[in-house]
Amino acid sequence: GCSYQSRQADTSLAEAPVVIKNFDGYAGNGRLMQQSFNKVPQRVLAVSESVVDDLIFLGVQDRIVAISACYSKNYAPYEEEYAKLTRLTEGTGYPSKEAVLGMQPDLIVSWGSLFGDSALGSVEYWQQKGIHTYVMTNTVPVKASGRRRVEYFVNDLQQLAKIFRVEEKAKDKIVGLKKRIQVLQLQSKATPKANKPKVVTLQYLYGNEYFCRTASDLTADMIALAGGISLDDKLGGRKSVEYLVKLDPDMLIVIDTETTPVADKIKALHAHKVLSRLKAVRNNKIFVVQHRAFYCGSLRTVEAVEAMQKYIEDNF
């Protein structure tokens, strides 16, 4: 009797539970699962910069008890916030199960690969321990989510805003993001096909092979939104440089990662006996995208597409 009433008096518990559907990670093939949040998470483990960026965007960074797998340059506008956060791990590695359990989080927000067999395993393991999970849509197996899209991270922001009960507070910011994406969609639609450059994404270069992204990756959607035509096809991964010569794109997107700096890749392209003949390399139509902007999705993604759109407008 009494304890129930006093609990009801506590407004944070009096609110109806927030029920959401979200994915498992790679260990569970990204299947959709339902979770019920009875209260606002207080101890969040945020894994990867894009996730941290998204939580700061929503203004809930005070709930983050630790961050992990954050190894690129901090996002400049959030520099101050990053400085206050505790790092559970340094560098590119994911934390161990023991390290995560030791932190006693009530919510883990991350990528699908964190919940893979070689890392934390299925989200089910955590949910059975009473620890909630949220896996970002653009990071789950593509067979679960379909091709990745810029707007999916905005859906994630809306779901997370619900979980943290900050929907009202975050509404204007989320609407602002949606408008920016709409503007890009309209500009892209209005651009005649003849004016759209054909674009290939290059992530790594290994002598006579290169590593590319696929048609279902977020980069393909970013290219389309920016007014280009993506030539990235169904199969990503390593391909022969001869294949790239056959495609001969008007423009290359080169991914900048912390471990493989972009300046080295661009230098290698110009010095390469085969790839230096590419139209995009000869004409120096190379656009750089940070790994952090194209994987998962955050404010940086929208900024990268806007910059790419301007680059295409100015150069083609």
Language-model regions: role of each:
Residues Y75, G112-G121, I131-Q159, P192-L218, ...:
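Extracytoplasmic ligand-binding site segments that recognize negatively charged/polar headgroups
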Residues V51-D54, V60, S96, A119-S122, ...:
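Stable alpha-helical elements in mature extracytoplasmic
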Residues C70-P77, T92, Y210-R238:
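Alpha-helical, coiled-coil/dimerization segments enriched in small aliphatic residues
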Residues S96-S110, V241-T257:
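Proline-aspartate-enriched helix->loop->beta-strand connector
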Residues L45-M103, L107-F115, L231:
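A short, structured surface patch at a secondary-structure boundary
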Residues R147-K162, K171, V254-F316:
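Structured C-terminal subdomain patch of bacterial secreted/periplasmic proteins
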Residues C2-D53, K162-L202, K310-F316:
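Bacterial Sec-exported substrate-binding components of ABC uptake systems
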Residues G25-R31, T86-E98, K234-E242:
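Short helix-initiation/N-cap motifs at beta->coil->alpha
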